[in-house]
């Protein structure tokens, strides 16, 4: 009996952490696009991607509330950090903003893929699995769109994207528990 209770609590903790980090990530992504759009105001491509991120954030906000999961305490940092990252990359050049999108979305692709692996046999989380699958497909679409818009044509592409990937991975790690 006690073992079943511990196992159930552990499974809930795992999905709670997933939802918390996904909500934080979608919030950060929205703030990156807000920063980019502050500079590239009429960019239809960025606006379209930003609109999808708003829907992603709304979905995870809803799940967070429904399940009574606390959001990350790091939201104020992701608020400012995401906005500054987006604004700074857009101020340098539109292609740099697109390279930022590629870097973030490559990490998110792997992050969501890992979550899919953990959830694929969990019959109680089919709805969450489908949502993550849908959002992963859209994040891959964002990456591909950014690549189509010459993201790789900037000097220092590898160095810049590796830096952004490292920051994104750190944000994911911290947001799971804090």
Give, region by region, the residue ranges found by the protein language model:
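Non-heme di-metal
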Residues: 1-178
């Amino acid at each position: 009996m006690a073992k079943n209770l511990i196992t159930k609590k552990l499974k809930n903790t795992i999905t709670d952490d997933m939802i918390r980090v996904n909500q934080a990530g979608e919030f950060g992504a929205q703030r990156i696009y807000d920063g980019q759009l502050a500079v590239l105001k009429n960019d239809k491509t960025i606006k379209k991607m930003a609109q999808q991120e708003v829907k992603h954030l709304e979905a995870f906000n809803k799940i967070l509330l429904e399940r009574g999961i606390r959001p990350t305490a790091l939201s104020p940092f992701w608020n400012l950090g995401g906005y500054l990252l987006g604004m700074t990359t857009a101020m340098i050049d539109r292609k740099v903003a697109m390279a930022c999108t590629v870097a973030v979305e490559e990490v998110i692709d792997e992050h969501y893929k890992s979550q899919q692996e953990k959830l694929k046999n969990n019959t109680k989380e089919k709805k969450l699995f489908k949502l993550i699958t849908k959002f992963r497909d859209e994040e891959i679409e964002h990456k591909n769109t950014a690549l189509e818009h010459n993201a790789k044509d900037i000097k220092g592409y590898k160095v810049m994207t590796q830096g952004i990937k490292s920051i994104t991975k750190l944000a994911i790690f911290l947001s799971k528990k804090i």
